[in-house]
């Protein structure tokens, strides 16, 4: 499969998770937008992705509804793993006409922070850090050399920025700013945008 345009990455730390992605939307080397948000908060969870923007947005909306339905029907919060598995099942249902996206899904529950990687047909892998999209090969090199699960969230943001900036330098389909979603162990979250020139 051809690499999907964009770069998104996530890291799991003892204090929470960080999801991030750059903002350039491009197809076939043509820049369509410099302000495409690829990191979304869904209740207590976060999702980031690379690929077809409409597919990522559709999956985000579907997950928002499915999570609310699950929690209302079962009268309890859904775990990160169960929510990720639900996303995996949705992706697998469309295996013959797949959503063209690679996704990172994460959050914090009673078991602590969790990060999952999903491909277009629903393969589900739990990991400590991951990068997806056309700039993933560059970004993962930075994450592998600098990742430490015990680092604090501020240091984690620095590493995420360093990895995405490295990917932006080498990948023409990535650029124009970075969105960062941080979900802390107490389930509070923050969203930041860093403009890159």
Curated annotation (Swiss-Prot):
Residues the record marks as active site: 7 (nucleophile)
Q: Name one GO cellular component term.
A: proteasome core complex, beta-subunit complex
Q: Keyword set for this entry?
A: Autocatalytic cleavage, Cytoplasm, Hydrolase, Protease, Proteasome, Threonine protease, Zymogen
Please give the residues making up the propeptide in this record. 1-6
Give the E.C. number(s): 3.4.25.1
Gene3D superfamilies, sorted: Glutamine Phosphoribosylpyrophosphate, subunit 1, domain 1
**Compartments, as annotated in UniProt:** Cytoplasm
- What regulation of activity is recorded for this protein? The formation of the proteasomal ATPase PAN-20S proteasome complex, via the docking of the C-termini of PAN into the intersubunit pockets in the alpha-rings, triggers opening of the gate for substrate entry. Interconversion between the open-gate and close-gate conformations leads to a dynamic regulation of the 20S proteasome proteolysis activity.
One family from Pfam that matches here is: Proteasome
- Primary enzyme class: hydrolase
As its record notes, the protein acts as a catalyst of: Cleavage of peptide bonds with very broad specificity
Write out the GO biological process terms: proteasomal protein catabolic process
- State the protein's purpose: Component of the proteasome core, a large protease complex with broad specificity involved in protein degradation.
Please describe the quaternary structure of this protein.
Answer: The 20S proteasome core is composed of 14 alpha and 14 beta subunits that assemble into four stacked heptameric rings, resulting in a barrel-shaped structure. The two inner rings, each composed of seven catalytic beta subunits, are sandwiched by two outer rings, each composed of seven alpha subunits. The catalytic chamber with the active sites is on the inside of the barrel. Has a gated structure, the ends of the cylinder being occluded by the N-termini of the alpha-subunits. Is capped at one or both ends by the proteasome regulatory ATPase, PAN.
Q: State the similarity comment.
A: Belongs to the peptidase T1B family.
The protein here is known as Proteasome subunit beta 1
Q: What is the lineage of its organism?
A: Archaea, Thermoproteota, Thermoprotei, Sulfolobales, Sulfolobaceae
């Amino acid at each position: 499969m051809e690499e999907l345009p964009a770069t998104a990455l996530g890291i799991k730390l003892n204090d929470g998770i960080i999801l991030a992605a750059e903002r350039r939307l491009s197809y076939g080397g043509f820049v369509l937008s410099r302000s495409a948000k690829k990191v979304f908060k869904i209740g207590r969870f976060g999702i980031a992705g690379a690929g077809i923007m409409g597919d990522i947005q559709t999956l985000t909306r579907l997950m928002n509804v499915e999570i609310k339905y699950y929690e209302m029907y079962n009268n309890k919060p859904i775990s990160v793993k169960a929510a990720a598995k639900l996303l995996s099942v949705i992706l697998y249902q469309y295996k013959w006409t797949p959503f063209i996206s690679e996704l990172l899904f994460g959050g914090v529950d009673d078991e602590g922070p969790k990060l999952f990687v999903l491909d277009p047909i629903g393969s589900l892998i739990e990991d400590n850090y991951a990068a997806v999209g056309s700039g993933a090969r560059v970004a993962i090199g930075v994450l592998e050399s600098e990742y430490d699960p015990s680092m604090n969230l501020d240091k984690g943001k620095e590493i995420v920025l360093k990895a995405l900036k490295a990917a932006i330098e080498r990948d023409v389909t990535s650029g124009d700013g970075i969105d960062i979603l941080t979900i802390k162990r107490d389930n509070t979250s923050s969203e930041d945008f860093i403009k890159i020139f």
